[in-house]
UniProtKB/Swiss-Prot annotation:
PROSITE patterns: RIBOSOMAL_L16_1 (PS00586)
Pfam families reported in the protein's UniProt record: Ribosomal_L16
InterPro entries noted in UniProt: Ribosomal_uL16 (IPR047873), Ribosomal_uL16_bact-type (IPR000114), Ribosomal_uL16_CS (IPR020798), Ribosomal_uL16_dom (IPR016180), Ribosomal_uL16_sf (IPR036920)
Keywords: Ribonucleoprotein, Ribosomal protein, RNA-binding, rRNA-binding, tRNA-binding
Entry's family note: Belongs to the universal ribosomal protein uL16 family.
GO BP annotations, alphabetical order: translation
Chain's role: Binds 23S rRNA and is also seen to make contacts with the A and possibly P site tRNAs.
Molecular-function annotations in GO: rRNA binding; structural constituent of ribosome; tRNA binding
Subunit structure as annotated in this protein's UniProt entry: Part of the 50S ribosomal subunit.
Keyword presence, RNA-binding: yes
Gene3D superfamilies on file: Ribosomal protein L10e/L16
Record's protein name: Large ribosomal subunit protein uL16
Length: 138
């Protein structure tokens, strides 16, 4: 699973998801990309499940880049615990995603394979996505 090796602070505030993603909204390496069209939080398990779905479909045919990293810790209190007495322990890490953010990039495959692979990956993710192609307006 993806998670930071070290962090400056163990716990983080909840924060808000507002606006669009301006950074990370263009294709950097690949020919095709999977772009988020709504905001949400991707856990490291969801990112990994989508990666496995893509790599299993394209097999050794293409090169895949993961463009998001889960660096935000999410805390949770144990069950049947009274309120108060501080913040809970870190349970998992998430990547905060805004609309327009490219999540995955793929190169070395044809249009149909990229479309099918990203379609399989989109089912594993909690945000709505669309396929983008290099050269087309994003």
């Amino acid at each position: 699973m993806l998670q930071p090796a070290r962090t400056k602070y163990r716990k983080m505030q909840k924060g808000r998801m507002r606006g669009k993603a301006y950074r990370g909204s263009d294709l950097a390496q690949g020919e095709y990309g999977l772009q988020a069209t709504e905001c949400g939080r991707l856990t490291s398990r969801q990112i990994e499940a989508a990666r496995v779905a893509i790599t299993r479909y394209v097999k050794r045919g293409g090169k895949l880049w993961i463009r998001v990293f889960p660096d935000k810790p999410i805390t949770k209190k144990p069950a049947e615990t009274r309120m108060g007495t501080g913040k809970g322990n870190v349970e998992f890490y998430v990547a905060v995603v805004k609309p327009g953010r490219v999540l995955y990039e793929l190169a070395g495959v044809d249009d149909a394979s990229a479309k099918k692979a990203f379609h399989l990956a989109a089912h594993k993710l909690p945000v709505a996505t669309k396929l983008v192609k290099r050269g087309e307006t994003l």
